[in-house]
A protein has these predicted regions:
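Conserved small/polar residues in nucleotide/adenosyl-binding loops
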Residues: 193-199
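An amphipathic, basic-hydrophobic alpha-helix
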Residues: 52-53, 63-88, 98-106, 127-134
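Acidic anion/phosphate-binding donor-loop and adjacent secondary structure
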Residues: 66-69, 148-151, 168-186
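Short His-centered aromatic/hydrophobic patch
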Residues: 91-97, 115
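A conserved, positively charged/aromatic
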Residues: 105, 111-142, 148, 156-158
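Helix-loop-beta element that forms the nucleotide-linked donor phosphate-binding surface
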Residues: 53, 147-171
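N-terminal strand-loop element at the rim of the active site
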Residues: 4-5, 9-17, 21-68, 157-163
Length: 203
């Protein structure tokens, strides 16, 4: 049975982070459930693994925080939304979320955001910039902690009719199979050189 639902995800780059792999997984899950799947991104390592027969990939400089490019991206997104008759636009980062907000307002499409982490909000301008992530029709929080963080720090931007979902991160059990054993020559040391604590963590 075919579906008329077409979902466009917008993310700065498709790297190997949590937001990026989540975007990748959802993009390939949607076609298996009779939905059309689209991604707008500027690039990234995961692009080469995208199944182009299932997912329509469009390149735009949505990684940029330049206000002019954010505005121009919104114009391109309007064209994409209308041309492909997109039903839902899902933004996973702040700069592209501003482009998506304008594009969905003008095209009257549903707008979803996923709040992946605690953004730095020192100063009113920075907090306003971050607030785009709670200006959507549906806000997805990646954990109960993020849900509480949104309610505590962005209440002035939240309307009473805002809809929230808390969706916890999962793993692909087919890929991370506990029964799979690595041979000794396949085992590699794990580096912890990039391990950092969140800025809001207090010891």
């Amino acid at each position: 049975m075919s579906s008329n639902i077409k979902v466009l995800q917008v993310i700065p780059k498709l790297g190997y982070g949590g937001a990026e792999t989540g975007c990748y997984d959802i993009a390939h899950y949607l076609p298996e459930n009779n939905c059309k799947s689209f991604i707008v991104t500027s690039g990234g390592e995961l692009i080469k693994f995208i199944n182009k027969e299932k997912v329509k990939l469009i390149r735009l400089p949505v990684h940029s925080k330049n206000p002019l490019l954010i505005f121009l991206n919104s114009i391109f997104l309007i064209g994409i939304i209308l041309f492909f008759n997109i039903s839902i636009v899902h933004a996973r980062s702040r700069a592209p979320a501003w482009s998506c907000l304008l594009a969905t307002k003008l095209t009257r499409r549903k707008f979803v955001t996923t709040f992946h982490g605690t953004y730095n909000f020192n100063g009113k301008f920075k907090k306003f910039y971050n607030s785009v992530m709670v200006r959507s029709d549906l806000i997805i929080a990646g954990s109960n902690f993020i849900f509480s963080h949104i309610k505590e720090n962005y209440s002035e931007f939240l309307k009473t009719d805002k809809k929230f979902l808390v969706i916890f991160r999962g793993i692909n059990v087919d890929y991370f199979d506990q029964s799979t054993k690595l041979e000794d020559d396949e085992k590699k040391p794990v580096s912890y050189t990039h391990l950092t604590l969140p800025t809001t963590y207090h010891v």
